[in-house]
Structure formats: structure tokens, C-alpha cells
Amino acid sequence: TGSSVLPEADETIHSGTGRYAYIKMRPMSLYESGESNGKVSLADLFVGKPFETQTNDLTIDDITYLTCRGGWPWATLISKEVALDQAFDYVDSVVNKDIQRVDGVKRSPERAKLLLRSYARNISQQVPLSTIRKDMLANDSSTLDEDTVTDYIKALKKLFVIEDLEAWNPNLRSKAAIRTTDTRHFVDPSIGTASLGLGPKDLINDLKSFGFFFEDMVVRDLRVYAEALDGKLYHYRDSTGLEC
């Protein structure tokens, strides 16, 4: 996450087809960082093995902390106070350096911040690009069209900061209309909380917002587990309200 290829490196001498394999490195899941006991296996669920509901010893304080800390490897090894700063430092680096270095295009750090904040306010929700643009315009007095917003989003996706969740469309004969708008997500929930300047106590004081960030963390972990099985994660929602 955040370790993108520099512009000049895009001009590869050899494509590497047949020689190299690309591996997507993600932030650590709760199982990888040792906070999840891993008693329920996704692989077992897919083959229909029976399972029992499991519990762990994590409290609401623990979960809000883990949401704000994120799955950054170094953050899992240091004190809680210092660990929470990692996401803030990461966001600062993205908006002030990486957003321009990723493809050599000059972009405004302030607009990058506005976009991250707007994404964080709409995290785990199916909102169109127009909604994000309006949210940014409320804090940007200059002209801001959808093409500009799209450009910033593409740059942040290339930096592995933003990773929306695609809608699953089974194309079945159903009277229910399938919602096809992507769900807005970060690669790690701590990017969203840091973008809004939130900490664990802020999430506890606003449990509704915490629910959206918690969903973002669940999506992060499920992506890790699904990809280990050569799978891909999608969301589903239809006009009847059925959602998964």
C-alpha cells in the first residue's frame, strides 16, 4: 500500500510474461497481526464443513483501536500511542508527496486531503462520484469538475490507497433490480480515520460512524482471506434491500 511504481519505471524493457508473477501486498489482517483467533475458516465454509459460532476476548475499545491502528506491520510491533501515529504519517506522505510522484502529474495536496476526507465520510457506502464531488465542493471554492475528481481517485487507486468494492451482478432472471454502484473503501480503515483526524475514543462516541469503518476493516480482511483461495470479493444489493 502506497508503494507504487515511479513514472520512469513504467517503461519496462521486458514485460516479464512467463517469467514473473505479480503479488499484491496488503496491510495485515487481524489474523496475521495476532488479534483474531482464526477459529472460523473461510476455506471450510466454501466446502460446506459444519462450524460453530466462535467468540474472542476483544472489547469495543480493542476493536476501535485496531480500526484506527490499521494493519501496518510496524504498527503491530510498537506501543499503542506511537502505533496510532503511523496512519497519520502515512496520509500526510500520500497527499504531500506520493500523489504527485505516482505519475509525475502536479496535484494539489489540499484537494487530495479533501478527497480522502470525503471518501472517509462516505466509507462503506454506495455513493456516486457526483456525491463525492459535491462534498468536496463544500470545502473547495475553486472550480472542481468530475474529471478532476476522477483523476485524483485514479492516482489514489494506483497508490493502493483507495480500493472500491465492485458490485456482483449474477445476471439471474429476477424481478429485483441489482445495484451496480461500487462501494467506497480504503485499502485499510486507518486511512479513513486518520483522514478525518479520528481516534478510538471518537469512534466509541459515534458508533454509527464506527460501524462503517468496522465494515471497511472487515472488507480488508475478507479480501486477504479470499485472495489466499484465489477468490475475489464483491458486494451485492438489490431493490428489495437484500444485501451482502
Language-model features: locations:
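Conserved RecA-like P-loop NTPase ATPase core
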Residues: 1, 33, 67-70, 156, ...
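Interdomain motor-coupling "hinge/lid" segment immediately C-terminal to the ATP-binding subdomain
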Residues: 3, 9-125
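Short beta->alpha connector loops
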Residues: 3-6, 239-241
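Hydrophobic alpha-helical segments and their boundary regions
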Residues: 7, 59-60, 177, 204
